[in-house]
Amino acid sequence: MICTKMKAACLLLLGAYTILITGCSTDQRIAKKVGKEFKNSQAIKQYQVGFALYNMDDKKMIYQKDADKYFTPASNTKLYTFYASLKMLPERMPALKYIEKNDSLIFWGTGDPAFLQFAVKDQSAYNFLLSSNKKLFFAPGRYSGTFFGDGWAWDDYDYYYQPEISEMPIMDNMVTSTYVNPNKINIVPKVFAPCFSVDSTKTTGNFQVTRDFLTNKFHHPAVAVKPGYNQQNPYKTSPQTTIEVLGDTLHKPVGLIDLKIPANAKTLYGAKRDSVLKHMMLPSDNFIAEHLLLVCSNQLGDTLSTTKAIQYINKHYLSFLPDKVKWVDGSGLSRQNLFTPRDMVYLLDSIYKQVNDPVKLFDMMPAGGKSGTLKNAYPKTDNPFVYGKTGSLGGVHNQSGFVLTKKGKTYIYSFMNNGFVKPTAEVRAEMVRVITYIHDNF
């Protein structure tokens, strides 16, 4: 009997040892082959590249190339904002803080990006204010930052991807102009229509709207509008602009009041958090990303501060990262952000565990060949094998996410490229080649 038990125990140990050795040898084989792909790539030798590949089953790195070096992440930063939002925000986003006092409804912004946002289309705050029979007053002053994040390119103030940051954003903080006929455009919000004027000195070229840097004066050339024309320009934010846009949208007057938010202020909840996160991730929406950090800050106290939110998140939720991050904004527009590829991998692993539902998580992320910013990066398919986040600035192009292999494995990867002068398409193609190789072979 004793011999039989000893024999069984030995067989179990031998089996476990065999599995361990097999697992190690498999990872070593993958590391060797992936390393060879990097070594033999002439393209990758021309710029700074960091890469990390992580085995989720064994909870260990398979292959690293300068994975402990710092890179400008661009919109890979949104993965940090995504994780922070999962940790700090309730399932329904705080849309407004308010009190009712005598004949007045006084409200404060929470930074909520969903107020009539063109993709989320949440109307919770709108309907709440519209249905009130009290006088409406907006109380500004919660936001402690500037209208642009640290390290942003101010030259980009007039581009759709860089709306201003404010405590109560409305309609993406942008003006949308669209084609009506060759001589007319439709302007939303309509309150900005009187701010548009024709620049009679420009009589050639395409119809394009521009805005003055410090004011809400919009100009367009004296040329015909072409069918299909659709443009978004950020508007210049201010408390006065906020109440004018609100009043025009609600078709009722909204006043300003100087009042600090009291402890007994109530919270109105609005859009579903996960819906907002998906609308941030798929198109890489900078506006949503920045304001999500303000909503996180709203959970901490009276002041809306990107810096305060990031400091809190770093202290309470990111201590597991192997490298200290330099994180300054929610979107990645700033070149001051610096993350390592291995940090990106461990963050994605924590996101995976936090959501605890791969189908749900992957639905919120761009999918290679199918959706979001990865739709055109990989061949068109209904069965994507890559789910992740891209990040691009001049000389910067990154991908971090999950790769599903033909052998049924799911690996986490981060592929960061900085300091290149060649076309971004060539850098992207090399990333796609390597990630596809991993999918096909492992």
Predicted regions, residues:
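Bacterial N-terminal signal peptides that target proteins for export
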Residues: 2-11
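C-terminal motif of bacterial Sec signal peptides marking the signal peptidase cleavage site
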Residues: 21-23
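Beta-lactamase-like hydrolase cores
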Residues: 25-70, 89-92, 130-134
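Solvent-exposed, polar/charged alpha-helical surfaces in well-ordered, non-transmembrane soluble domains
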Residues: 32, 36, 80-83, 166, ...
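Residue-level preference for non-acidic, small/hydrophobic
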Residues: 59, 78-82, 168, 246, ...
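Small-residue-rich helix-loop
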Residues: 62-64, 293-442
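Active/ligand-binding-proximal structured segments within catalytic/core domains
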Residues: 71-85
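Conserved serine DD-peptidase/penicillin-binding transpeptidase domain
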Residues: 87-323, 441
